[in-house]
């Protein structure tokens, strides 16, 4: 289980003033049963579509451009994730991680390392 290491990456990025850069929030425009952001903003408030939601609300959840935490939850975490958020892996200096389609996690300290991992996963055909 990598929950504590993933949490450490997010803690490290926040402490460094970086964006979170999380695909969890990046896929927010998809209207499906498992999209907390879309379902909680588009439906209940009557916007009807992602594009109808005011830009300032959409941008507040864009973890690739907005620094700090998103404006609100991006999912409904389980106990393991909550515990990892409270107690991330200690002495972990990673700033990036990438998953593959086999369920493995790959961690990197620099963007160059992260891009190399991503390219390798792509070449193996196991990048999500």
Predicted ranges, named:
Residues 1-128:
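Bacterial extracytoplasmic/cell-wall-associated proteins, especially those involved in peptidoglycan
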């Amino acid at each position: 289980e990598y929950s504590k290491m993933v949490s450490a990456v997010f803690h490290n990025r926040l402490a460094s003033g970086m964006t979170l850069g999380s695909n969890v929030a990046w896929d927010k425009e998809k209207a499906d049963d498992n999209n907390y952001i879309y379902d909680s903003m588009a439906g209940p408030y009557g916007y009807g579509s992602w594009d109808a939601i005011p830009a300032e609300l959409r941008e507040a959840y864009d973890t690739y451009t907005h620094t700090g935490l998103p404006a609100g939850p991006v999912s409904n975490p389980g106990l393991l994730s909550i515990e990892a958020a409270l107690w991330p892996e200690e002495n972990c200096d990673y700033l990036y991680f990438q998953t593959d389609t086999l369920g493995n996690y790959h961690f990197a300290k620099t963007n160059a390392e992260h891009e190399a991992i991503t390219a390798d996963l792509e070449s193996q055909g196991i990048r999500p």
